[in-house]
A protein has these predicted regions:
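Feature responds to low-complexity, polar/acidic, surface-exposed segments characteristic
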Residues: 1-55, 66-82, 89-95, 454
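Second-shell loop/turn segments in exported
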Residues: 3-9, 45-47, 73-76, 125-126, ...
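Noncatalytic, helix-rich "gating/capping" subdomain that lines the substrate-entry/channel surface
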Residues: 143-438
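Intrinsically disordered, low-complexity linker/terminal regions across diverse proteins
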Residues: 337, 341, 397, 408-412, ...
Length: 726
């Protein structure tokens, strides 16, 4: 009751009162540890917290479950709704992690989450993400073993050793500083007209293979997947659209400090660097405002914009695009793709003498961002400092780690072959291929049983499955363009920078040769040592590199149910991408085409809208919620994957669905900083990892049956609200 002796049941419950009641109901809340400590909210305290709350309110606030408002205050006297109470209750379930019926993900993963850490050099940790670190270490060992002994000149091993040695030659890189790019920086600095700056841009493209403010390249032709199309791009935003529109002042200051640091490292005074950093920021913000939202870049209807060179030239009337096109080395083409016309128009407004200072600042900054890491350590340190300030993540690496990472990225085709020979089993390849074929049959059965799709559209969908190409482990043939790269050791006069430029030249030569030749659809989009998987709509294929086919996602000694909840979920997810809101716009040949009846597509769009609503606003960490619109394509894939792996498990005699569902939870266990969670919530087209477990499982009747989940439990949702597409 109240001090006056009354109970006052009709009074409005305030935020502070609700928090005190919460503490009393649970007998005191634990202090957050591990992942909860990293993602806790309100740990700085609230200046308007009422004194009367005493230790009870203090305990709740120190548990990290109170996010407060945008102004940084608690607003203790604000009224609390039933929805507010449910949100607080869900946060407590997550913090406690003691009941599968209330928060499955947190309960299954509690021991791991509470004891988790983030190793230096890793932005996110978890069984899935940690596998990337394991593979990186495996590849680094291959590289260091090769670099430790003499190699036969001209062999892949000799090039690996030479590149590694130049990265490790820190003393030489420090002594050289920005000398390798000084002539280009000077040329930018002395350009007095927009025409002169474009001449520098053309020179950069020809001599270094760099496009800094605009350029042409090749990409997939959405209308004919058997050919490439020329693509035009102009400078864009280095950060996310949300950053420029909604970023905090602290975040913006961190980015400006990073830009300023890069520019001072290139030889500018602090004052000049600060001024140019502001020019870069303003231009990027303008382009970002005119750009598509992140999820729109997956929509072929929005990004397939074909222009003639003369059409683009009208946007850039003060410069010669013909000169820039010639510098690209591409053969003439009357079809040029522009993925984001709004961003292009915003950038074009700077291509005149009035925008010269901004373009010069952009060009200089772009060079430094592109090749600064090949020069002295200051550029690497600046990046590490920014990452820590902006994302709350320590990406510090030893010189050996940096060298191995650079060699892995630049000589990936050589190392992919070596990785497969050392770390991949044919048994894993065979098991994955068998699982894929089984899933394809399950999908056919499920599609045939759909009650919202006509037979005509079903046959088209099944055709997409029948023609889907499967890539597992490694490619049938290996790329050879690196054989043409002139990679020299320090003793031969080679430097990290010169070797990078030589590799880029070889890659460009390969790209130019592809312009007027049929697309080789046996090419891989990923390296064998990549811990990821993908579906390509323009090839209608699924790719599962060797590195992902190992523990903890796949284990030859694990139960069938556990492998289904690990690698099975990922395989089924990629297959479903052929039928998400983006993949559904491509046919069996990888061409953008409408294979739907009008009525069926309308029904599909309604299904997708339901999926967006199912996820939208779902809170994962205090004050951090999911965007249904941003994540719709990945969520459709997740939901389809869950249906598929449950169907596969139910074909077993006496399937252990508890093992299956726990494996799903284990797969998506992850930890990172709160800043990174906030960043991913507005940029990542995947739902937060916790929702890839909980929100997906909440759509499965088998999940409720397995754990006896009933109304009133935290994981319960009414059957009529649960969504399903495939």
């Amino acid at each position: 009751g109240y001090p006056d002796g009354n109970l006052d049941l009709r009074g409005t419950l305030t935020r502070a009162q609700a928090l005190v009641m919460l503490d009393r109901a649970f007998g005191g809340l634990p202090a957050p540890v591990g992942d909860h400590a990293r993602t806790a909210a309100g740990m700085q305290g609230f200046s308007d917290a009422p004194v009367w709350g005493g230790e009870e309110l203090s305990r709740v606030l120190s548990s990290g479950i109170v996010a407060g408002e945008a102004d940084g205050l608690l607003h203790p006297d604000a009224p609390v709704t039933r929805e507010n109470l449910q949100t607080l209750l869900s946060r407590v379930y997550a913090l406690e992690g003691t009941n599968c019926k209330d928060d499955f993900y947190e309960t299954v993963n509690k021991t791991w989450l509470d004891s988790s850490d983030i190793p230096a050099g890793l932005s996110v940790n978890g069984p899935f993400y940690g596998l990337s670190l394991t593979v990186t270490e495996q590849v680094a060992k291959l590289i260091s073993d090769i670099a430790a002994k003499p190699q036969t000149p001209g062999t892949p091993e000799a090039k690996i050793k030479a590149l590694y040695d130049t990265v490790m030659d820190v003393e030489a890189r420090e002594a050289a500083g920005v000398a390798p790019i000084q002539e280009y920086l000077d040329a930018i600095e002395t350009a007095k007209t927009i025409s002169e700056l474009i001449d520098v841009e053309c020179r950069l493209q020809k001599e270094l293979g760099l496009s800094t403010i605009l350029g042409f390249g090749l990409t997939s032709d959405f209308e004919d997947s058997n050919r490439k199309v020329v693509a035009f791009s102009s400078f864009g935003a280095s950060m996310t659209k949300d950053f420029y529109e909604n970023g905090t002042q602290e975040q913006k200051d961190a980015y400006l400090a990073y830009l300023t640091k890069l520019l001072t490292l290139s030889g500018l005074s602090e004052q000049a660097a600060t001024e140019r950093a502001k020019l870069v920021y303003a231009a990027e913000a303008k382009v970002a405002k005119a750009s598509y939202d992140p999820q729109e870049y997956g929509d072929v209807d929005k990004i397939n914009n074909i222009y003639k060179l003369s059409d683009i030239q009208r946007q850039f009337s003060k410069i010669s695009l013909a000169k820039v096109y010639e510098a690209s080395g591409l053969a003439p083409s009357d079809r040029i793709l522009v993925t984001d016309p709004g961003a292009m128009r915003a950038a074009a407004s700077y291509f005149n003498d009035a925008g010269l200072a901004t373009l010069k600042a952009l060009s200089r900054t772009a060079i430094l961002m592109s090749v600064g890491g090949c020069l002295n350590q200051g550029f690497i340190e600046a990046s590490v400092e920014f990452t820590k300030a902006y994302y709350g993540i320590d990406m510090t690496q030893t010189t050996e780690q940096i060298a191995a990472q650079q060699v892995q990225g630049l000589l990936a085709d050589y190392l992919g072959r070596a990785y497969v020979e050392a770390h991949f089993s044919e048994k894993a390849k065979q098991d994955a291929e068998e699982m894929i074929h089984e899933f394809l049959e399950i999908y056919k059965t499920r599609i045939e049983a759909l009650d919202w799709m006509s037979d005509a559209t079903k046959q088209k969908a099944i055709c997409n499955l029948d023609t889907m190409k499967i890539k597992v482990g490694y490619p049938d043939s290996w790329e050879t363009y690196l054989d043409n790269a002139d990679i020299k050791s320090p003793s031969e006069g080679g430097t990290f920078f010169s070797n990078v430029i030589s590799i880029q030249a070889s890659a460009k030569e390969k790209t130019l040769a592809e312009q007027n030749t049929p697309v080789d659809k046996t090419d891989w989009l990923m390296e064998p040592f990549t811990v990821n998987a993908c579906y390509s709509a323009t090839s209608n294929d699924i790719t599962f590199p060797a590195a992902i086919l190992q523990k903890p996602l796949y284990d030859v000694n694990a139960s069938r149910e556990e492998n289904l909840g690990g690698i099975g979920y990922i395989i089924a997810h990629e297959i479903t991408h052929a039928f998400d809101n983006n993949g559904a716009k491509f046919d069996e040949n990888g061409n953008a085409a409408n294979w739907w009846t009008e009525q069926d597509y309308a029904a599909f769009q309604q299904k997708c809208l339901q999926v967006a609503n199912w996820y939208d606003g779902q809170e994962v960490y205090p004050g951090i919620a999911c965007s249904g619109a941003l994540t719709i394509s990945e969520n459709v894939a997740d939901l389809g994957a869950a249906k598929c792996i449950v169907a596969a498990a139910k074909k077993l005699d006496h399937p252990d669905l508890d093992k299956l569902f726990r494996a799903v939870a284990n797969t998506w266990a992850s930890t990172t900083s709160r800043q990174m969670r906030e960043y991913l919530a507005v940029t990542d087209v995947h739902a937060p990892d916790k929702l890839r477990c909980n929100r997906v499982l909440q759509t499965l009747p088998e999940f409720y049956t397995t754990y006896g989940i009933q109304p009133g439990d935290g994981m319960w949702t009414a059957p009529e609200t649960r969504v399903s597409v495939w």
